[in-house]
């Protein structure tokens, strides 16, 4: 089975690394400070070479042509290989998911939402939404993911877009003491009922403790559309997805940015 038809289906239909998400990880780059001496200086050379060889730099086929990303595309070998041949954890970071596309487009079109503010990108993946926040003038950014390879990919993607890399936390942030953020953004995270419940409670605490603004990107997955969080959402903007994204996401045609206010 091709990689694109195996591991990718989990997020679209609800599986996705729950065991890994519930385990603790590590701090790849320190929170609250920017330790880079230069783009890629903290990358393992072998993994960096592997990512550069097995991903494609692209800015087409998404809602944000301004942002270049290293992604897994049909022109990449591992798009077609058996999933078990990929030597690392499943590369969910290598797909630009539709919820993240919508969030990134919204931040680029509305820079006042993040300008001069602190932003947490929860479940950052390829880092596109954090990159959009940086491009739009956010003063402090933390990208969070559970996969160390995602952290390395985010650093490479910052380099592609001529940005100084921002801090990246590789850990299940839901298990940590909450920090104060002006804005929390999360895209494509409501793919499992248990995870959705945990996110809902964490976001409510974040809102009531710090009055943090929360924006959620989702293309209408049933685990999100049918969740009780819907009672606390208002639609901010809806985007039509490009045809290539529709084909890769089970025919989903739009992606929406939602504001959360419990």
UniProtKB/Swiss-Prot annotation:
Protein-lysine methyltransferase that selectively trimethylates the flavoprotein ETFB in mitochondria. Thereby, may negatively regulate the function of ETFB in electron transfer from Acyl-CoA dehydrogenases to the main respiratory chain. It is found in: Cytoplasm; Mitochondrion matrix. Its EC number is 2.1.1.-. Coiled coil: none annotated. Residues 1-38 form a transit peptide. It comes from Homo sapiens (Human). This is Electron transfer flavoprotein beta subunit lysine methyltransferase. GO terms for biological process: methylation; negative regulation of fatty acid beta-oxidation using acyl-CoA dehydrogenase. One of its GO terms (cellular component) is mitochondrion. Interacts with HSPD1; this protein may possibly be a methylation substrate. It is an enzyme of class 2 (transferase). The keyword Cytoplasm applies.
């Amino acid at each position: 089975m091709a990689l694109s038809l195996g591991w990718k289906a989990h997020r679209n239909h609800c599986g996705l690394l729950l065991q890994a998400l519930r385990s603790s990880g590590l701090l790849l780059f320190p929170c609250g400070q920017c330790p880079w001496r230069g783009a890629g200086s903290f990358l393992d050379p072998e993994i960096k070479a592997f990512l550069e060889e097995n991903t494609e730099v692209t800015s087409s086929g998404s809602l944000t042509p301004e942002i270049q990303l290293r992604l897994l595309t049909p022109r990449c070998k591992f798009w077609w290989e058996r999933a078990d041949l990929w030597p690392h954890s499943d590369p969910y970071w290598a797909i630009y998911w539709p919820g993240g596309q919508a969030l990134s487009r919204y931040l680029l079109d509305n820079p006042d939402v993040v300008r001069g503010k602190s932003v947490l990108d929860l479940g950052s993946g390829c880092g596109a939404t954090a990159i959009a926040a940086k491009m739009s003038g956010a003063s402090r950014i933390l990208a969070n993911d559970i996969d160390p390879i995602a952290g390395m990919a985010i650093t490479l993607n910052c380099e592609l877009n001529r940005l100084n890399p921002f801090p990246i936390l590789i850990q299940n942030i839901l298990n940590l003491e909450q920090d104060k953020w002006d804005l929390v953004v999360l895209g494509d995270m409501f793919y499992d009922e248990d995870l959705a419940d945990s996110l809902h409670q964490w976001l409510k605490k974040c809102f009531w403790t710090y009055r943090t603004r929360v924006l959620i990107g989702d293309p209408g997955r049933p685990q999100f559309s049918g969740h009780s969080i819907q009672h606390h959402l208002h639609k901010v903007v809806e985007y039509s997805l490009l045809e290539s994204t529709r084909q890769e996401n089970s025919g989903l045609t739009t992606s929406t940015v939602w504001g959360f206010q419990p």
